[in-house]
UniProtKB/Swiss-Prot annotation:
Residues 1050-1059 have a biased composition (Polar residues). Keywords: Aspartyl protease, Endonuclease, Hydrolase, Nuclease, Nucleotidyltransferase, Protease, RNA-directed DNA polymerase, Transferase, Transposable element. It comes from Drosophila melanogaster (Fruit fly). Residues 812-967 form the Integrase catalytic domain. GO terms for biological process: DNA integration; proteolysis. Coiled coil: none annotated. This is Retrovirus-related Pol polyprotein from transposon 297. Residues 998-1059 are annotated as: Disordered. One of its GO terms (cellular component) is DNA polymerase complex. It catalyses: DNA(n) + a 2'-deoxyribonucleoside 5'-triphosphate = DNA(n+1) + diphosphate. The lineage of its organism: Eukaryota, Metazoa, Ecdysozoa, Arthropoda, Hexapoda. Residues 1027-1048 have a biased composition (Basic residues).
Amino acid sequence: TKRKFSVNSSGKYEYIKIVYKGRSYKCLLDTGSTINMINENIFCLPIQNSRCEVLTSNGPITLNDLIMLPRNSIFKKTEPFYVHRFSNNYDMLIGRKLLKNAQSVINYKNDTVTLFDQTYKLITSESERNQNLYIQRTPESIASSDQESIKKLDFSQFRLDHLNQEETFKLKGLLNKFRNLEYKEGEKLTFTNTIKHVLNTTHNSPIYSKQYPLAQTHEIEVENQVQEMLNQGLIRESNSPYNSPTWVVPKKPDASGANKYRVVIDYRKLNEITIPDRYPIPNMDEILGKLGKCQYFTTIDLAKGFHQIEMDEESISKTAFSTKSGHYEYLRMPFGLRNAPATFQRCMNNILRPLLNKHCLVYLDDIIIFSTSLTEHLNSIQLVFTKLADANLKLQLDKCEFLKKEANFLGHIVTPDGIKPNPIKVKAIVSYPIPTKDKEIRAFLGLTGYYRKFIPNYADIAKPMTSCLKKRTKIDTQKLEYIEAFEKLKALIIRDPILQLPDFEKKFVLTTDASNLALGAVLSQNGHPISFISRTLNDHELNYSAIEKELLAIVWATKTFRHYLLGRQFLIASDHQPLRWLHNLKEPGAKLERWRVRLSEYQFKIDYIKGKENSVADALSRIKIEENHHSEATQHSAEEDNSNLIHLTEKPINYFKKQIIFIKSDKNKVEHSKIFGNSITTIQYDVMTLEKAKQILLDHFIHRNITIYIESDVDFEIVQRAHIEIVNTTYTKVIRSLFLLKNVGSYAEFKEIILQSHEKLLHPGIQKMTKLFKENHFFPNSQLLIQNIINECNICNLAKTEHRNTKMPLKITPNPEHCREKFVVDIYSSEGKHYISCIDIYSKFATLEQIKTKDWIECRNALMRIFNQLGKPKLLKADRDGAFSSLALKRWLEEEEVELQLNTAKNGVADVERLHKTINEKIRIINSSDDEEVKLSKIETILYTYNQKIKHDTTGQRPAQIFLYAGHPILDTQKIKEKKIEKINEDRREFNIDTNYRKGPLQKGKLENPFKPTKNVEQTDPDHYKITNRNRVTHYYKTQFKKQKKNNKLSISQAPGTR
């Protein structure tokens, strides 16, 4: 039978407004309809096929698409809705059957409707000329008809030519169920309600920038795109005091060759005051590294990704922009905001969290689905599509790649065997014209550098081009080396090198090597390479010793491959045999010690291989430059990336608030305790399995920051693997501590341990005692408590003497970075004449000024002449002669803003002393010659020859070449600012470096005492003495004091000291 569908003879329509997932919808109520209807693009839910004939005044129509609206806060059970654009003003139509099931009550007195025990306001609207619909429901369902499903989507634009008949048939049936996910150009774009973008700024003062002037053609384009965004509901008119200018950037021409443009908003000033969102963006290498052993890949393309996220209401006004026609603001998240990528990544992780790393991986709006079989892959696609549909997101299905054996993802081609460069970008490189300008060189190197991991010895090949980027360097495109470098890079990209994807079940091998000018490394498994890396050494690194360069290669390579190596046992292969004893070096030096500490977070073994067997890494580190290689441009590795791996720390777990301790035993038991305010969970287990580890993580990893201790590396690998698989289901940051100390329960027990150890070890001092205790025990504020206990020790107070510094401590002299930064002066005497000798440390430029006497006035006048000729230095270093030590000369130098630094007694400065030896040698040579004219101008001839004629051994240049054409540090204000900023850290670094040398054979004196005086002895009257020790006063009778003086060598004149 045919039933009339909802025609209101009064010409008025009754509807209610419901809120579902944060969005309001208009629901038309029709007691005469036996079905429910919903407009297209309201919800992205899987479509079922159920035919229904509808008769209208214009003729019959057929409805085929049915969605099942899931149970929610409004509808208490799943309800069917036919998909059809039945109205332009309403979103849904609720029929009689649903109204009856909901036990609806319409109260016209109060204009309310009760639906499922919830009351809504009844709204009446005027007629909108809807069609008069008559429906006839057919009982049969055709949901199982695959032939019907094939007709639902236009697959002519889909990329399915690579599929066989079975794959095509199954895929089309699956895609048709999710037809509502497809976005077509011109449709109204939906948005997700899982997240809103919030603009947190440092202040609320409006940011206003004037509109940029645009060409007339661009103004027309801007207005057209603004109108389109208004129609789609992406923007609205604004009254905001904020304003950011619009500009136009060109896009690729369309198929007809017509120019295309994109309107963008310049949010740079807004971004400057935006507080950065530290949500981690995944590392591309890390994502690509998880795609091994897969046979099928599907890449998903979200439609206008950022625009599918709603703006927070309070942040909308900050996105305001203006055009010639008006002032607008974004309702959806626009492109160009500082934190937009982080918000989008957070959104995608929240939506797909249960599927990440198991079925799919996400990088911003790029989603890749991976599986090992067809059935598994189709199931993975359905799971991902269901999550996206629940989040109300739209896809550009015609741009997606389905069931591919080779997928284009993040600029690479992912295959079951490995990763290959993208052929599209390879084609762009091949057709690239030879660069003739700096900007073109940088663009080309940026394009090829994107694939540098596939090119062994990239730094060597690109060197002739990178060297052209130096200042004042002419680009010679006819130069053979330049052309060869350019063509070779293109030829190497044309090749199809395939790198193996990492298998995290196997052991990694990191092979490194360093040459005089570059570093190289290769990461491999079972002899198959995973990635090649190389870079040149900078000017500072060129002066490193052989072992320093080899260790630098290891430090740099482990940092680059951190996400592969951290938390895993791996092997380092090097042809530098001394590195095998890296951990056993007693005095490695400050630089090696810092690098050794940096490598301590890794678990590795160093193996020696012969140089000829290390051909790959050796080739990567060889850079063949015939001359002037010291100042060549340097290629640097990428910054350290974020990682999902459990990080390691050498700090004992006892110092952390949330502790989880794994103990292997014959029991399976969990205990909770608390000590010193720290929460401790002790998990006893017999055998660790992956399933057990996952359950432990889900049950106990519930806090924001957790530190774990697990002794067995094998069991830790299992926990690590479990954490990687479920890391995106929690917000927990996990650190593994390598040490577990014994907690001392009470102060009495703590004091007993200290006193017993202190006596047993013959009364060590505070620092030694603290270190000994902390090796095996933990007690809060132990250092301060140990200090108090030892301060009260009578034996220490009476027996230990003072250690006074007798000489200045040895310090490493920092190298100057400019000419005129540091002068070294001394008094030089020869043949009855006296001179002030001066040498610039940076350039080795030397000069002498004659003086009549050695008093400070003559020295000042000589220094004035030197400063007039050479310029004033920042630092003047001199011996402790009477003239240089005079207070008058020091004050004059302070007025001239020159810092004076005096050497210790009997400790000459090597540079100027060597200059004196050279001058004496030259004088003896001149005196032995017969040239009388030269004898009359000995000093002038010697200085001219020294500065202008001879290259210095240290610099490799003539001193005058460096000194006369170098800049002046006083005028370089930016560097002065940078040095002031670094001053605090500089002092600390110098102190740390000095500690390695203060115990060495060159340190003749004792160290300066950083502590305050601790003991003072004075005679109060003829019969009594008073000893003050750390504010504790003890009185002695003279006979008792003399006895202690004899036994402990105390004296009244004794100065304060430490133990």
